[in-house]
Amino acid sequence: MSLCKNYAAGVMLAMLTASSITVKAQTKPVPQLGKNTIQEVIAAMTLQEKCMLVVGSGKAPRPAMKAGVSSGYVAPPPMIGKTERKVPGAAGNTTAIPRLGIPSLVLSDGPAGVRIDPHRKGDSTHTYFATAFPVGTLLASTWDPSVVEQVGRAFGNEVKEYGIDILLAPGVNIHRNPLNGRNFEYYSEDPLVAGKMAAALINGVQSNGVGTSIKHFDANNQETNRNSVNAIISQRALRELYLKNFRIAITEAQPWTVMSSYNKLNGTYTAERHDLITTVLRDEWKFKGFVMTDWGGGYSAVAEERAGNDLIMPGRPDQIEDLMSAVQHDSLSMKVLDENVAHILNIILKSPSFQKYAYSDKPDLKAHAIVSRKAATEGMILLKNEDHALPISKNIKSIAAFGNASYFTIAGGTGSGDVNKAYVISVAKGLANAGYTLDANLETSYTTFINDTTQKLRAIARAAHHWPGPVPEMIATDETINQKADNSDMALITIGRNAGEGSDRNLETNYTLTPSEQQQIKKIADSFHAKGKKVVIVLNIGGVIDMNGWKDNADGILLAWQPGEEAGNAIADILTGKVDPSGKLATTFPVKYEDVPSAKNFPGLPAGNPDHVIYQEGIYVGYRYYDTYKIKPMYEFGYGLSYTNFSINNLKLSSPVFNGLLTATVTVKNTGEVAGKEVVQVYISAPTKTIDKPAQELKAFGKTRLLQPGESQVLTFKINAADLASFHTDASSWITDSGNYVLKAGASSRDIRQTANFSVSKTIVVEKDHNVLKPEVAIDEYKGK
């Protein structure tokens, strides 16, 4: 249907929905939400009111780049209403119907902090900044759901105190490929880690009486042509990887809403797939909330409503007309529309807006900054530490900090994942706060260069009508480097990389360090090492990068990710030894990009403007691929060093024969000299007599409390039949095969410390699922070795 169809009438509808719907006074009282049953309220609604409720309003989606064009944008279609009335900068809202006691819900981005306008018209005395919490890759690297839940509780308080009902987070999509521009928002290459971390965040946020929207359902694993690309995936890969993460989070935390994704899945837009949204999500997983589109997602409003995609965001006037016409002409049943309305009303009943919560606009940002800083330290990963380069020696007093990101440290990614925060503590500032002397001339040089270059790039972008490009790294002269080696006690280099919504990362300039960057690292290392001084590199990045050609130049490497607004303070906490590093990788760093199993199938075909992407690697994503095909990674899944050492011993199983539930215990002991925490990862190798399987899969994990030197803790893990099951496509069932299994407990996927054998005597059919979501074409999938 043309966007211009009956547009004049659409404008009239839009005006009606700008704040509410009004109907002529009636002679008898009408039902009221909360006082009457939802069925009675729905029965009192007009068709127009129902259609307006399921078509929301708010910000237009971000302008989309024209395919194959380097500049210029496709203008977004006209949207209904504005969001400025209640919470300026919020992403959108639902339509209020005052005569029936139905308020408007306010929806806001984003995954690392509330994303609203920090300044408001007519209010010069108050600001509305939000806390920038660590990004998803860092939170997953804590391997500690309790830490993530604590972040969620603080996060949810800001959601509530700023007058928001539903947070459009978390994002839980799998790290299929390291070039995905939004991997920073997501958690892991492994569905167990991703699902558990998302559940923790949801539980924390929703403990405040506000809602979340888990996204992007499903298989939104790239930004290139995300609005139209067709993800072609086998049923098994969907069930075991790309749906399992959502299932874990939804069943363990019951988010109020689910957001469907932009892309097509096996030929159909996800927002229009009844088998995905109703059969799998509602019938199989028992989801009770409502489903909304991503902003401007999908194609047909009628098809979306038929599929069970309850709320269309942010709606257009013509969509309301389409829905009304569809009901009147029997192409959309009133029963389906009523069910979708009921799903939305059930959530409205729980909302702060319905309960008339008197939000303060004054959350405790100082307290939340403390939460953010602590969480950031828990998820930073020590990748390299030669000759005790870290923690920084007590005889170090002065530091030469190189790298743009030492002074303009990246708190988080861009797009809807960005946060309007009051400040970001830079790496240099954090070290200064810790008592170190930073080279003032270097700071002046970097600050001047970055400010001047930023202004130039913005001017160029405005003239060409495109987004500004990233500021290139300032390259210090040989003379400057040698001078700093003479005058400073150590060198610190911060490597910064950013990405975000709307585009994927560039292999040559974002994933890989540029030749000039690599050359500068070598020059700094050579100069400082010649003076007997250490060189430490901090990685201020949102996703995996190529470390070939330069990592050997560093004595120590700290993967700090994008740690939120307290970045520099948290980094200093780790570098100084105030906090022992305990983070572990939740995604693999390959030796080279070509080793990535999806490298030749990302972002799809035809090259340059893909309309489809084949998930040929099937279930062999991340460590499942590297371990099965015996490919050595740069840093394996689960890897992370500490300033102390731990032993993992005394693995015991409750029984050598599986009888429905297996309990495993291990003893972790701090055998080093400083207090620290260890993560124990439980992998299982399963028999492959019926179908191929990965060499091993993560089935459980746990993190110790802070153990003092010599202190021990017993960790307990429970494994059930569902944990052992694989999805058998022919039977459309989850089946635990009979045979011999090996349970492995270790500090990473390649650092296994203890093993134990057990057997399953009879094949167990754990669950029979619907035979849905079939790919339209045959896929020549990887089959393991």
Predicted regions: what they are:
Residues 762-777:
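Low-complexity, Pro/Ser/Thr- and charge-rich linker/hinge segments at domain boundaries
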